[in-house]
């Protein structure tokens, strides 16, 4: 029996030293004066009257008295816990292994969350001196709240770096301020996101040795993965507004993947000439199938922040469902010869058939020959 548990915290290693509100205004004013100087010197053309550049040129940036460190609104101290438990037992005829684990993490970006639990069970039983059975199975459950717009220039951290420090994070209505020169980093935290995975899989096998040096093995394995992803921009939020009025947007998707593999092999391994020649011959058959299924629906015009599911949407404006399946059947063989642990010769072939290809082109043969010499 084994058990371990740990807890840790996470901080950003090198936090950027950003300008405060007054420093930002001073830099802007210096740039404005340099721009005017270049125009007067004929280096740059004057901007069109009434354009954004023209208005900015005429008007110095106001001293708002606001000093916002946007990173304070985006970052936090992250935390991670890790718990592991395992049990193993067995002897000559039977073996068992069981484990359960959980990793829970809150990232340094606010609302970022990751929680995964795993269970594994391996059992092997020797029936006779020639026959044994085994089962390897597992289950995984993942629940996460991903960073909104992750891997995107508009994700919270990037926006916090770009946002002007002389502007307030919230407006008079208590919502994230929209009067910024870039996206408000706080808009990301208005979105409700849920992403969940479940995976279950197992491998059942039997190994039989009818005579010395000959091993027959049959196995059946499979896995099922399902995912549910949901996001909601509530109507009474900046993200959920339309033309400044409450509206709301929702999106829901599911993914289901199934896979199974059947494999049968016969392996013969024998030494000749007082062990100088080793012959290893393998022949087998396998069949594998994959199935992929996904769908999504999105809608808008929600009556309330509390009604988050698409059944409450006033309009369903998009949707799709998709299914794909493919199979691969194989027959294979391999013969390997080794002399004095120094000279090696291998001959192999595969005869594969795939459902991906058109009728008359589904099957192909793939022979191979290789030779080797072990230097030392």
Predicted region positions:
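A beta-strand signature from Gram-negative outer-membrane beta-barrel systems
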Residues: 1-2, 80-82, 95, 103-106
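Outer-membrane beta-barrel initiation region
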Residues: 73-77, 87-91
């Amino acid at each position: 029996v084994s058990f371990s548990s740990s807890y840790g915290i996470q901080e950003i290693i090198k936090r950027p030293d950003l300008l405060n509100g007054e420093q930002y205004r001073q830099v802007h004013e210096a740039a404005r004066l340099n721009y005017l100087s270049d125009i007067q010197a004929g280096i740059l053309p004057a901007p069109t009257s009434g354009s954004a550049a023209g208005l900015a040129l005429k008007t110095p940036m106001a001293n708002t008295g606001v000093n916002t460190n946007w990173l304070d609104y985006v970052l936090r101290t992250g935390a991670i816990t890790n718990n592991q438990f395992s049990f193993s037992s067995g002897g000559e005829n039977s073996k068992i292994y069981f484990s359960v684990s959980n990793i829970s993490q809150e990232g340094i970006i606010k609302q970022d969350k990751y929680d995964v639990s795993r269970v594994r069970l391996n059992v092997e039983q020797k029936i006779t001196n020639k026959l044994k059975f085994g089962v390897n199975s597992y289950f995984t459950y993942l629940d996460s709240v991903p960073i909104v717009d992750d891997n995107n220039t508009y994700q919270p951290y990037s926006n916090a770096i770009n946002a002007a420090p002389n502007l307030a994070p919230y407006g008079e209505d208590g919502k994230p301020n929209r009067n910024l020169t870039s996206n408000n980093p706080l808009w990301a935290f208005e979105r409700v996101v849920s992403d969940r995975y479940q995976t279950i899989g197992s491998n059942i096998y039997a190994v039989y040795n009818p005579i010395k040096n000959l091993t027959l093995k049959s196995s059946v394995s499979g896995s099922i993965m399902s995912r549910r992803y949901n996001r909601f921009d509530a109507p009474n939020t900046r993200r959920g507004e339309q033309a400044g009025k409450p509206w709301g947007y929702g999106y829901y998707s599911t993914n289901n993947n199934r896979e199974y593999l059947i494999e049968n092999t016969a392996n013969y391994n024998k030494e000749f000439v007082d062990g100088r020649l080793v012959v290893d011959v393998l022949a087998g058959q396998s069949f594998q199938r994959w199935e992929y299924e996904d769908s999504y629906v999105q809608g808008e015009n929600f009556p309330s922040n509390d009604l988050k599911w698409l059944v409450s949407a006033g309009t369903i404006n998009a949707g799709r469902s998709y299914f794909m399946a493919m199979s691969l059947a194989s027959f294979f063989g391999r013969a390997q010869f080794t002399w004095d642990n120094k000279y090696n010769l291998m001959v192999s072939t595969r005869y594969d058939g795939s459902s991906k290809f058109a009728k008359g082109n589904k099957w192909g043969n793939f022979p191979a020959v290789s030779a080797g010499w072990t230097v030392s």
